[in-house]
Amino acid sequence: MAAPAKAQNPNPPPAATGPIYTLAFFETVAGSHGRTAKLLRGYSAATQGADGNVAILALHEIGRPARFAIIEVWRDKAAADAHAAALGSLRGALRPLLTAPFDIRANSGIDVAGDPVGTEIGAARAVYVVTHVDVFPPGKDQTVEMLKQLAEASRKEPGNLCFDVLQQDGRLNHLPLIEAWRDLAAQNDHATADHTRAFRNKLVTLQGALYDERLYQPIR
């Protein structure tokens, strides 16, 4: 009797090419904002001088003082990989303050325009938004097209400074958004705009997880 055929593994996603967007999220104990911000400023300054770095932005979540994020943009995967040890050192320095481990995700840009994130005119006072869009795999391609349409419309809003659509490496149905707005009022206008509401209404039937939208202010 012949042995049953083994199931074939699906083809792995292609290796990322072009710029790499590293997103890192972490949470700290209450009252540690000052120490955390100091470490992040030092890390940002050092990273700006690293070979292959395009942008680095440290963020503090609005209304959630214990939550932080880091956005790094690298020329390519090799440059991002070369800097991974430095990010590991930061994680080690922050370890006594952490209430949850670092969540680090590598992404590629699928609809990116304008100046690199964090270098926009008005960036020092901007409100940044990082959103994790997670859809069921069969709806990935439809969602990508919807996000491209949303990005095009959102960039035309008067208070928009940045609207980038990313795709997580290895999990192509995970589609982070990076936005920058002139202020909270501009971000609220976007949230209630017709094109945003239409997008959210379509997306809800495709979502594999809650729409995770977080608002931040930059750490300078």
Label each PLM-derived region with a short phrase:
Residues 121-162:
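Surface-exposed interaction/gating patches
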Residues 27-38, 134-143:
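Short, surface-exposed ligand-recognition loops at beta-strand->loop->(often short) alpha-helix junctions
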Residues 8-14, 56-59, 114-121, 164-166:
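Short beta-strand/turn micro-motifs at beta-sheet edges
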Residues 100-134:
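Surface-exposed beta-loop interaction hotspot
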